[in-house]
A protein has these predicted regions:
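Active-site neighborhoods and metal-handling regions in enzymes and metal-associated proteins
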Residues: 1-135
C-alpha cells in the first residue's frame, strides 16, 4: 500500500486485519483443504475482527469470495468461496485478495500463490516489501 502522507491508525489496523485473513486462507490451502473451508475460516476471522459488514464490499452488496484461481483467464475455478468443495490442485495458482470496503475507502492485500508438493508459495511479493510505504 503506497500512501501519500500518512495512513490513519484505523486504516493501518484494517490492513493488518486483511493480512491476517490472507494468512488464514493461505494456511488452509497450504494444508490441502477445500477452498470452501478456506472461505469459511477467512470469513470467520474477518467477522471476529469486526469486518463482517465490510468484507469484499459494503452490506448488502458484498462479493462472497476471498480469492480465485488464475490461469489462461484471469478468474478461474476453484474460487475461495462457499460451494468449492475441493482443494487448489498441485500446480494450481490463486490470487488471494481480502479487502474491506467502507464509504470512505477500501484497503486489503492481494498476492498470487502457487501450490506445489510442499504447500503454498508466493509468486508475487507477499510482504517482501513493507505493507505500507509512506512518502
Amino acid at each position: 500500500m503506497y500512501v501519500a502522507g500518512s495512513l490513519s491508525s484505523q486504516w493501518e489496523e484494517r490492513l493488518d486485519d486483511m493480512v491476517a485473513v490472507k494468512e488464514e486462507v493461505v494456511d488452509v490451502l497450504d494444508q490441502g483443504l477445500d477452498c470452501s473451508q478456506a472461505w469459511r475460516q477467512g470469513l470467520a476471522l474477518a467477522e471476529e475482527l469486526g469486518h463482517g459488514d465490510n468484507l469484499m464490499g459494503m452490506a448488502p452488496d458484498q462479493s462472497r469470495f476471498l480469492g480465485h484461481s488464475v490461469g489462461l483467464q484471469l478468474d478461474e475455478s476453484p474460487v475461495v468461496a462457499e460451494g468449492f468443495d475441493r482443494p487448489l490442485p498441485i500446480g494450481g495458482t490463486m490470487a488471494i485478495e481480502p479487502k474491506v470496503v467502507h464509504s470512505s475507502g477500501s484497503i486489503g492485500s492481494e498476492d498470487t500463490w502457487v501450490r506445489d508438493e510442499d504447500g503454498m508459495r508466493p509468486i508475487t511479493m507477499d510482504g517482501a516489501i513493507p505493507w505500507i510505504t509512506q512518502w
